Amino acid sequence: MYLTICLKCIDYKCLDLAIILKIKQEKNHMKVITISRVYGAGGHSIGKKVAEALGIEFYDKDIIKETALAMGIDPELIKAAEEHITKGDTLLRAISPISYDYKNTIFNYERNAIVKIASQGPCVILGRCAGEILQEEGIDCLNVFLFADSIHCGKRVGEILNTTDVNVIAREIKKQNSSRNAYYTRYTGKHLMDSQNWHMTLDTGVLGFDTCAKIICDAVR
C-alpha cells in the first residue's frame, strides 16, 4: 500500500507554527555559553559565529553599556576602568563617583549585568568572569576557553594592530594576557589558563574558527 500525500491538504500555517515552537523549545533547553580566551585566539569572532548559528544574542560591549547605565556614568569610563583595573587606583579614583571600594563596585555592577542578561535566556557572553559568576548563581552554562599558539595569536594581533613588528605584537599579547589573568584571579581566586576551570578548551589555531564554533554549537544543542 502506498501513502499519497496531497500537498494542497497540508496546513502550512500549522507546520510553520510547529517549526517555530520546536525552535523555541530548543532555545529553552539551551545553556548560556561563556567564552574566555587568550589574546588573539579569536574569541569575539567565534562567539559571534556561535550566536548567529544558534539564533541567540551575543554580549560583549553590551555588558559595559548595561553597567554604565546602572552606575550612571559614561560607558567609556567603564571601558577604561576595565583596562586599568589591575594597574593601580589612580584612574579609578578619578573617574568613579563612588567613594568606597571602587574596583569591586565596578565588578559587582558588571556581575549584576551578566546575571540579568543570562536570566533572560540562552546567549553567548564574552569574558568578564561570566562562567564563574553564573555557576555561583546556579545558572546552567557551558564555559569555554579558547587558546592558540604564539604564531596564530601573533598573526591575528598583527592584523588587529595593523603592524608586522614582532616585538610590538609580543608585548601587546603579553600585556593583554597578563591583565586578563590578573582580573580573573582577582575575582575568582583561580588561574585563567587552568583547564580545570572550563568545560571545554579549544585550540583555535589548529581547529580554525568555523570548526570551533560548530563544536560549541553541537555541545549545547
Question: Could you say what each language-model-derived stretch is?
Answer:
Residues 4-29:
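Short, Lys/Arg-enriched N-terminal segments with co-localized hydrophobic residues
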Residues 35-48:
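Glycine-rich phosphate-binding P-loop
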